[in-house]
Amino acid sequence: MKHRVLYIYEGKLSYHGIDRVVREQLLALTGGGCLVDLASRGDPGIDGVSFLGRKWTIANLISWLPRSVYYPAQKRVFMRLGARLADKHNYTKIISWRDRALLPFRVASRKGIPCYLSHDSMHWRGTMAETNPLPWPSLSTSEMDEEYRLAKQILLPSENSKDSFLRNGLPEEKLKVIGRGVDTLLFAPATSRTDSKFRIAFCGRVCERKGIRQVLEAWKIASIPNSELLVLGNVDKSLGDFVDANASGNIRWLGFQKDILPFLQECDAQILLSRREGMAKSLLEGASCGLATITTKDSGFPMQDQINGFLVERESTAHIAELMQRLDKNRALCSEIGAAGRNTVLENYSWGAFQKRFLAAVAG
């Protein structure tokens, strides 16, 4: 008899970001012989997955409101749908992403169904949820704690994320690091370059948390001739004036790009100076392309300093500038570090490897 699994996630199941992670988890489940009931806004079209979600919900009526209201409202809708499905059917297990799991996990606890919480970030303590908690419809911190408590396993993107849970008292046996994945055949080094200009990519939301101010400060200090900094990602509204003030020179503000591969393949290195990041998937994609990586511990990148990348403190802009200059002047070193980063991805972070880790984590 095949296992029947309820999977809850309110996204549209595109091929980007967390949507892609969800797709890979669904493929892993069906490939492992499970039948999946999916509560989401998108039908992935995967054999063995029954779409029981809604492409339009009542929360769409408030889609004009700020993200901080609209997205939690959608999560509440699918949390309630998940609870109804959990109450109606006898599932072998329930898998839900954080902030969508509370009500279905309560039902599952009553029925004795094991629950698995997929988490994309850090424990809520030390994040905006603690320092500036959002009102309803966001979950309260006590509700987040209840999700943690009801989960049999919490599936985490990095060791850094796991450490944040351990520091806050969660037992190690509840925490499973499954990492992330990347299409290593697609994200591969370029066979040739159009020119020899030294380029660094910043790929991610352009916001304070990702360290864009520090990146630009280091870039200006480095002042590398014949070079470009490519900034790929949506800009936070609060940084509009900052971007306008830095819109000239050798900084290219490219906005959000559905296809980042052509830009990565024109670069030599990548940089992200994140705080409180679960796992920066864009860094895995850049590393898979053979880019030398400069990042912080908080990015979640599997770093061996000066072997497969460079680990830095985000405020050490003078040191970061020196690294940029060093990689420009020593292209052989840049290529060597980039190749080591790609090997790390090939060995541990293909989507196939990710699927195996995920299946092992939810096997109990």
Regions found by a protein language model. Name each.
Residues 160, 181:
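Carbohydrate-associated surface elements
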Residues 326, 333-347, 354-357:
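A short, well-ordered alpha-helix in the C-terminal region of glycosyltransferases
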Residues 58-69, 115-145:
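Acceptor-binding helix/loop patch of EC 2.4 sugar-transfer enzymes
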Residues 80-87, 102-103, 123, 134-154:
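Membrane-proximal helix-turn-helix segments that form the acceptor-binding/catalytic region
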Residues 297, 303-306, 310-317, 326-331:
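Conserved acidic donor-binding segment of nucleotide-sugar-dependent glycosyltransferases
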Residues 191-210, 216-221, 230:
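Conserved donor-binding/catalytic core segment of Leloir-type glycosyltransferases
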Residues 256, 275:
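Aromatic "clamp/platform" in nucleotide-sugar-dependent glycosyltransferases that forms part
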